[in-house]
């Protein structure tokens, strides 16, 4: 088929797809391709980046990330920090409003954080609040009286937060999705009536946009909030957020003008990467992200660290970035990307197939003999994940004599499988929540909400705990280096593959407010049209 005809078919298919699901909605000011359909916009539930992008447009924390990924004043217009670095006093804006016109108060934040920490809510990211005095004990059921947690509303507009230890990244945490405030009266009313409080007809937020429509697997329509304190500086009157897990479909929408912005690396068709990265609307920059493999340490044969190490030692990471990803990614030997807040990780593992085969034989599987059937789990809507899975399958077969089976799952099912440890080994990713090694390292403490490997190591746990209290940066980094050696080189519950490169497609001569940054944060409130 001629190339021009093929492209025309793609254009018509994309247009038909959009027209078939748009119904009565006119085109929004900005159309944004967001990746997978969000699982939720409840801050206590959110674990994925697509969900967080939507929530951050609908709600605003004490601080908020700007276009450069820097935490700036949000609902809190300023704050004070005690001399010992343990007590923050936040001064809230008197003109901060919920979308129903009510004032946002210090008590709203306390009630929202209490909800996230309530054990019955089972918030996976509740640990992001553990820096607050008493928060962990309350979340884990040892403390029953929430008034003993280090949160105090001095008055409607003054919130005091007492930390266990000085936490240099706490202001970044205050901008993170888990710490966003929710409108508790609405949640209570909806739960009593058996309603879903996140539906457009029920939702009350305090962010720069409000939720007008949510059509599953079609679009989320946001409109500029009339009650947001900084509404005069919001550039877009309306935004459509489109879900698309298929890179070719997403790119067709973008390239035919049906979408204005594509800011999820997983939506870039990898077979076209070498051609696409030379386009003027292709924007790439390093950011704090890692693509890695998780091993289920509770399930044989990966309960044996020798098996985990054997698998890790035969992976040709350079081949993966050269053959598949092709956007300038760097093979990873650590979980924490080098240079994160000045941190340099330990050396990690180098590829060593001979040692891998020795370890596998010592574990009772010489030449792969007797190795059970195992499944590599990955997202079924991602061509990139599939291509990496096929390449890994070949490496394990050639070097270890083991043929793994490939298992694809839809995004929500995949997340559930990880959380319930219903997998053997799986594709995983992590994007830093803030610019500090801790955002990567504290994932793998025993029973951590994002551990999802079943791995536990008391020495590692203690190191992460001690690092949280260490005030001298180099001493703190040395503690992290020792812990990361345990994680990657000694016990290997995970195997890092490569460090992420953030990719966005947009016309920079027309669209402003999209900036490369280490957190890959691109707030919708910052975007505006230079020209249409």
Language-model regions: role of each:
Residues 126, 174, 233, 261-353, ...:
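Local pocket/hinge segments that shape ligand/substrate recognition
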């Amino acid at each position: 088929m001629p190339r021009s005809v093929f492209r025309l078919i793609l254009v018509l298919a994309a247009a038909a797809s959009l027209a078939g699901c748009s119904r009565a909605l006119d085109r929004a000011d900005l159309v944004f391709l967001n990746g997978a359909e969000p699982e939720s916009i409840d801050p206590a539930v959110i674990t994925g980046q697509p969900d967080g992008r939507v929530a951050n447009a609908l709600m605003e924390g004490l601080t908020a990330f700007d276009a450069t990924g820097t935490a700036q004043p949000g609902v809190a217009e300023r704050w004070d920090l005690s001399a010992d670095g343990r007590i923050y006093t936040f001064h809230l804006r008197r003109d901060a409003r919920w979308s129903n016109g009510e004032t946002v108060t210090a008590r709203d934040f306390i009630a929202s954080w209490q909800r996230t920490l309530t054990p019955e809510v089972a918030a996976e990211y509740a640990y992001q609040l553990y820096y607050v005095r008493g928060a962990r004990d309350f979340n884990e059921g040892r403390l029953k009286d929430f008034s003993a947690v280090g949160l105090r509303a001095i008055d409607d507009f003054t919130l005091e937060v007492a930390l266990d230890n000085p936490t240099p990244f706490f202001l970044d945490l205050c901008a993170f999705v888990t710490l966003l405030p929710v409108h508790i009266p609405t949640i209570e009313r909806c739960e009593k009536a058996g309603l879903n409080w996140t539906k457009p007809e029920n939702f009350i937020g305090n962010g720069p946009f409000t939720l007008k429509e949510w059509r599953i697997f079609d679009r989320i329509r946001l409109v500029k909030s009339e009650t947001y304190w900084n509404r005069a500086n919001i550039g877009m009157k309306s935004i459509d957020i489109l879900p698309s897990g298929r890179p070719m479909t997403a790119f067709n929408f973008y390239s035919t003008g049906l979408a204005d912005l594509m800011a999820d690396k997983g939506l870039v068709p990898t077979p076209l990467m070498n051609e696409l990265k030379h386009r003027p609307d292709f924007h790439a920059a390093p950011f704090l992200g890692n693509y890695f493999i998780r091993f289920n340490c509770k399930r044989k044969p990966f309960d044996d660290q020798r098996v985990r190490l054997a698998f890790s030692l035969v992976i040709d990471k350079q081949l993966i970035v050269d053959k598949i990803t092709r956007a300038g990614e760097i093979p990873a030997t650590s979980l924490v990307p080098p240079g994160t807040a000045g941190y340099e990780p330990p050396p990690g593992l180098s590829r060593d197939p001979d040692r891998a085969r020795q370890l596998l034989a010592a574990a009772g599987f010489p030449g792969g003999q007797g190795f059970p059937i195992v499944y590599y789990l990955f997202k079924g809507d991602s061509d990139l994940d599939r291509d990496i899975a096929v390449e890994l399958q070949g490496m394990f077969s050639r070097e270890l004599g083991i043929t793994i089976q490939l298992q694809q799952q839809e995004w929500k099912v995949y997340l559930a499988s990880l959380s319930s440890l219903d997998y053997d080994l799986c594709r995983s990713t992590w994007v830093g929540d803030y610019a500090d090694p801790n955002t990567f390292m504290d994932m793998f403490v025993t029973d951590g909400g994002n551990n999802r490997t079943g791995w536990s190591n008391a020495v590692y746990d203690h190191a992460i705990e001690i690092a949280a209290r260490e005030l001298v940066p180099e001493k703190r980094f040395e503690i992290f280096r020792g812990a990361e050696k345990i994680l990657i080189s000694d016990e290997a519950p995970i195997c890092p593959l490569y460090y992420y490169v953030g990719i966005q497609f947009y016309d920079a001569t027309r669209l402003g407010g999209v900036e490369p940054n280490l957190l890959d944060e691109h707030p919708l409130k910052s975007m505006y049209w230079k020209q249409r």
